[in-house]
Regions:
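M16/MPP (pitrilysin/insulinase) zinc-metallopeptidase core fold and M16-derived inactive scaffolds
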Residues: 1, 203-266, 328-332, 448-462
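Scaffold signal of the M16-like zinc-metallopeptidase fold and its non-catalytic homologs
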Residues: 1, 47-93, 108, 307-357, ...
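Single conserved hydrophobic/aromatic residue that forms the stacking wall/gate
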Residues: 2-8, 12
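Short beta-strands and strand-coil junctions in structured, solvent-facing domains, enriched
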Residues: 13-14, 26-33, 196, 208-214, ...
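Acidic/histidine-enriched segments that form metal/cofactor-coordinating
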Residues: 19-22, 32-64, 246-352, 514-532
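Buried hydrophobic packing residues in well-ordered domains
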Residues: 20, 44, 99, 185, ...
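Extracytoplasmic
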Residues: 32, 39, 94, 109-112, ...
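Proteolytic maturation boundary segments
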Residues: 38-42, 69-215, 361-363, 368-412, ...
Length: 588
């Protein structure tokens, strides 16, 4: 008995289903290749090694999952030490033939189940039961050849680049980091931690981002990150890269933000050089793959068509239009827009953003040995191209709509539901205290709405509050409140939501709510001290915003009063900027 569940893309195309069943039959009939098995085994053993290295830092959730599987399925709980030792002995000695026998047992000639799921949309046709059964019965008569796994023995980089030099080094910099300046202008901050034995995080960032490009490129820069990724790097397609990196714990990806271009990475300490090589190739050798791009477009069209069938997809589009007043840089992706994506222009834009590393700052946080890392940093990051541009981001005039704006529209839904979004915006200085006050306000509102809307009225599963304090391109504050309910209750509950927000602006929070939030924030702050991601964000914020988001944190949290929160929320509401978007169902 086997169930095969896959996203088929254009499910109405019978060829997709036929190919899926055909490849399953090929694996059943001929099995896997030695190279496929070797990669799968290497990846499995690497994941075990990572868990073993982190055994002193195992999260509670990992134990819970093991206990649940033991209770439900009788799965043993040997512990990671025993499992790691056992599998390192067993895995290399399990022959490929044994694996292929298991595949034949998993996919028998009978007792097969094919499940096809997709949107109910007019004009979208699915294979019938008879067609599926016919396909299944025809598999055993197909003329198939064994799969040939094309594996290159070519290294990720044939030769190391002509590296640069570290021209200055300063220990004891911000947050206990070491600052390195390279000969090509790249600045590096390295913070060694012992929070995770098997993790090094990396971020490289530079000012500019999407803001550098004109409005007419909005569609292209909206999809740039995904399009660039499908091509692979250097001489390797995306598929070939996964083969080359088998058994390694490493990843690197590039991204274009509104005001910055960034490269992100993570690796095990033993794979640090591989991360440096991938970073070098990310800057210097993005790969064009027309076939992979066409496949990407087909997948994207299918995803967008599926999203269109989901009424909830329209609420975000409506909110974005309301917020930015149909600004040309706000792209609402539709299936018919996919063919307008210009691959060559995307590559041109990407290369423009990454052809000059001289203004990039890199941060490394984790179990990194500085003396081992320094020559690799100099060799690969020091070799990145530099033309010494002096850049910053541009103001693209994407201002949030001022005043009061309301939009209510109806859409047919399988389960009649009203979705309501409130957005309040205004000016606010970008300070640590305001950032803390915003967190207080959203958490207090979450508790108030749980009590007043969910528990007393029973009208929703929950009201969610989100806040965002921004410094660039200009200082502003956003508060968003979202909930779903029965259309018959939407007006009453929306009234309660607004009234409770106004009450907070007039009276501030209760002592009980205030103390609960303080306790949580202080505990979270203490927990964060042992998180690599927390220190990575602090390093980035320090240099991007020019602000230490840790200095005096606990003192500020402890000093916050109900009056502080009342004034903070009141100052926002007094600016009079409110957007309300409601999606409901047609009146019958």
């Amino acid at each position: 008995d086997v169930e095969r569940s896959r996203g088929l893309g254009d499910v109405y195309k019978r060829q997709a289903l036929k190919t899926l069943l055909q490849e399953t039959e090929r694996a059943r009939r001929f099995g896997f290749t030695e190279s496929e098995y070797a990669r799968a085994r290497a990846n499995y053993l690497q994941s075990l090694e990572s868990a073993y290295n982190e055994r002193e830092k195992t999260k509670h959730g990992s134990y819970v999952r093991e206990y649940v599987q033991n209770f439900l399925n009788g799965e043993p709980i040997p512990g990671i030490e025993a499992k790691y030792a056992m599998m390192n002995q067993l895995a290399p000695n399990i022959p490929l033939q044994a694996m292929n026998m298991v595949m034949q047992q998993l996919v028998p000639d009978s007792n097969q189940v094919v499940i096809i799921a997709g949107p109910a949309k007019e004009g979208l046709k699915y294979p019938t039961k008879e067609e599926v059964i016919s396909l299944l019965k025809g598999m055993k008569d197909l003329d198939l050849q064994a799969y040939v796994d094309k594996v290159s023995d070519e290294p990720l980089m044939k030769e190391a680049p002509k590296g640069g030099k570290i021209i200055s080094e300063k220990e004891g910099d911000i947050y206990g980091s070491t600052k390195l300046v390279l000969s090509n202008g790249v600045t590096v901050y390295v913070k060694k931690t012992d929070f995770k034995a098997d993790e090094i995080r990396m971020k490289g960032t530079s000012l500019g981002g999407k803001s550098i490009f004109p409005d007419k490129d909005a569609l292209n820069f909206a999809v740039m990150d995904n399009v660039i990724a499908v091509g692979g790097l250097g001489n390797f397609s995306q598929v070939d890269l996964t083969k080359v990196l088998a058994g390694k714990k490493v990843s690197v990806n590039a991204g274009l933000g509104a005001t910055t271009e960034n490269v992100f990475g993570t690796c095990s300490p033993k794979d640090f050089e591989t991360m440096m090589q991938l970073t070098y190739l990310t800057f210097t050798a993005p790969r064009k793959d027309a076939e992979a791009f066409e496949s990407f477009k087909n997948r994207m069209k299918a995803q967008l068509e599926s999203a269109q069938a989901n009424p909830l997809s329209s609420i975000n589009d409506s909110l974005q239009k309301a917020m930015y007043n149909n600004h040309p840089r706000v792209v609402m992706m539709k299936p018919e827009m996919v063919d307008q994506i210009d691959y060559d222009r995307i590559l041109e834009m990407y290369n423009d953003r990454f052809k000059d590393a001289s203004d990039f700052t890199f941060y490394f946080v984790g179990n990194i040995d500085l003396e081992t890392a320094k020559p690799l940093i100099a060799e690969y990051l020091g070799a990145l191209p530099a033309i010494n541009r002096k850049e910053t981001f541009k103001d693209t005039k994407m201002s949030i709509r001022k005043g009061v704006y309301k939009n209510e529209y109806a859409k047919e839904q399988q389960t009649p539901t009203a979705t309501i979004v409130f957005l309040y915006s205004g000016k606010a200085p970008y300070t640590l205290k305001n950032d803390i006050l915003l967190s207080f306000a959203t958490q207090v509102l979450d508790m108030v709405y749980t009590e007043e809307v969910r528990e007393k009225e029973g009208g929703t599963y929950g009201v969610n509050c989100y806040g965002d304090l921004q410094k660039y391109p200009k200082e502003q504050l956003l508060l968003q409140i979202v909930f779903q309910t029965d259309p018959a209750k939407k007006d009453k509950l929306a009234g309660i939501v607004v009234d409770e927000l106004k009450k907070l602006a007039a009276e501030g929070p209760s002592d009980v709510h205030l103390q609960k939030v303080k306790e949580y924030m202080l505990k979270k702050y203490a927990d964060n001290q042992k998180e690599n991601g927390y220190w990575m964000n602090n390093l980035n914020d320090y240099f991007y915003y020019g602000m230490d988001m840790t200095e005096g944190y606990t003192d500020i949290v402890n000093s916050i009063t109900a009056k502080d929160i009342q004034k903070f929320v009141s100052d926002l509401l007094k600016q009079g900027n409110e957007i309300e978007v409601t999606m409901t169902v047609p009146n019958k």
